[in-house]
Amino acid sequence: MATDDVNEPLPAAAELPATEAEKQPHKLERKWSFWFDNQSKKGAAWGASLRKAYTFDTVEDFWGLHETIFQTSKLTANAEIHLFKAGVEPKWEDPECANGGKWTWVVTANRKEALDKGWLETLMALIGEQFDEADEICGVVASVRPQSKQDKLSLWTRTKSNEAVLMGIGKKWKEILDVTDKITFNNHDDSRRSRFTV
């Protein structure tokens, strides 16, 4: 059985009609907000320049924002980018953060590349809900500090007292970062004193 159109080329993928599912944005489990802070003014109160930049809840919005705006290599000196759950401010005083702390990874080698990679891997892990203890995580902060030559990422938690949860978060984050460096946990109410190291 032969047909007349056997040798006709198939339509290119761009010519095929998209299904309804392909047209729909890919929703995330929860909404997230990017924040920006530039602490370059001496004597300014902490948080005086902190601004919410954008809230999103789809994979497509995340990639558009990350690719055009929110990359650590685009930060100026003493600036910070934050990604926090929508409704949570990246401040110790926020009720979601007040009884928590933060895991911190200090980046000293290949700083720009390492910080960019660690930032992106952490963002994808957060919005992709890769942490078993995702409800205990508030967000992440990327800080650029050229004077001290120590850029850093800090993963903020809701708890400071549940050691099992904190160690689970710390170990998973270190696995996500794929680093041998130590990461340290500090309470928000006493961020000068290290509590855990993995």
Curated annotation (Swiss-Prot):
One of its GO terms (biological process) is negative regulation of defense response to virus. The keyword GTP-binding does not apply. Belongs to the eukaryotic initiation factor 4E family. Abundant in floral organs and in young developing tissues. The gene is EIF(ISO)4E. According to the redox status, the Cys-97-Cys-138 disulfide bridge may have a role in regulating protein function by affecting its ability to bind capped mRNA. MRNA binds at residues 46-47, 92-93, 145-152. Keywords: Acetylation, Disulfide bond, Initiation factor, Protein biosynthesis, RNA-binding, Translation regulation. One of its GO terms (molecular function) is RNA 7-methylguanosine cap binding. Transmembrane segments: none annotated. Disulfide bonds join 97-138. This is Eukaryotic translation initiation factor isoform 4E. The keyword Disulfide bond applies. Recognizes and binds the 7-methylguanosine-containing mRNA cap during an early step in the initiation of protein synthesis and facilitates ribosome binding by inducing the unwinding of the mRNAs secondary structures. Mediates susceptibility to Turnipmosaic potyvirus (TuMV) and Tobacco etch potyvirus (TEV). The modification N-acetylalanine is found at residue 2. EIF4F is a multi-subunit complex, the composition of which varies with external and internal environmental conditions. It is composed of at least EIF4A, EIF4E and EIF4G. EIF4E is also known to interact with other partners. In higher plants two isoforms of EIF4F have been identified, named isoform EIF4F and isoform EIF(iso)4F. Isoform EIF4F has subunits p220 and p26, whereas isoform EIF(iso)4F has subunits p82 and p28. This isoform interacts with the viral protein genome linked (VPg)-proteinase of turnip mosaic potyvirus. Interacts directly with LOX2. Interacts with BTF3. GO terms for cellular component: cytoplasm; nucleus; plastid. Residues 1-25 are annotated as: Disordered. Residues 8-19 have a biased composition (Low complexity). Disruption phenotype: Decreased susceptibility to TuMV and TEV.
